[in-house]
Amino acid sequence: MESHNVSNSLNLDMEMDQEKAFDYSKRAQWLRAAVLGANDGLVSTASLMMGVGAVKQDVKVMILSGFAGLVAGACSMAIGEFVSVYSQYDIEVAQMKRENGGQVEKEKLPSPMQAAAASALAFSLGAIVPLMAAAFVKDYHVRIGAIVAAVTLALVMFGWLGAVLGKAPVFKSSARVLIGGWLAMAVTFGLTKLIGTHSL
């Protein structure tokens, strides 16, 4: 009985040590790309739709502009992330070869494809939110309110998800994402509204 308890205690200690030893920084690359992509998808697509709506309040025009922003943004995010992470990959490979006598530990290297896919997928998921919020609302002002409300909820959700996956403080992460999204949306909407008003 005593040996059984000792064995269970050892197993629990080993599990705790493994959890502590787990390097959460390994998640950082794709997590950073995913959070960045989601925020960009939410904010840029919503701002684009609201900006276009300031000039032409037709729901079809707003949806088409948002869809175009989704496709272009997802491609841009994926390509940019792939190039960026691949540059980092090459640098780390060269450094490993110098330090390890030509040996490369691939499991420690960032994945360009993973980062690019996460970025594009997250952007698309984020961009769908304002599209769906605006799709079934006929009144322009109600439509804008629905977009802002949906984007706000989505920003909080993505901030919470990023904090949970990265083992970071939930409140700080969610607040940072939400405030940043609001600021970006306000600036982009204000500028596009100004341009549309003055017909520049």
Swiss-Prot record:
Expression across tissues: Expressed in the vascular bundles of the shoot and the stele of the root. Expressed in inflorescences and at lower levels in leaves.
InterPro entries the UniProt entry points to: Ccc1_fam
GO terms, molecular function: iron ion transmembrane transporter activity; manganese ion transmembrane transporter activity
Keyword terms, alphabetized: Ion transport, Iron, Iron transport, Membrane, Transmembrane, Transmembrane helix, Transport, Vacuole
The keyword Transit peptide is assigned to this record: no
Annotated compartments: Vacuole membrane
Main location: membrane
One BP annotation, GO: intracellular manganese ion homeostasis
TM regions (residue ranges): 35-55, 63-83, 117-137, 144-164, 177-197
Induction section of the entry: Down-regulated under iron deficiency. Induced by iron supply.
Ranges in a coiled coil: none
GO cellular component: vacuolar membrane
Family under the similarity heading: Belongs to the CCC1 family.
Other observations noted: Can mediate sequestration of iron ions into vacuoles when expressed in the yeast ccc1 mutant.
Matching PANTHER family: FE(2+)/MN(2+) TRANSPORTER PCL1
Name of the featured protein: Vacuolar iron transporter homolog 1
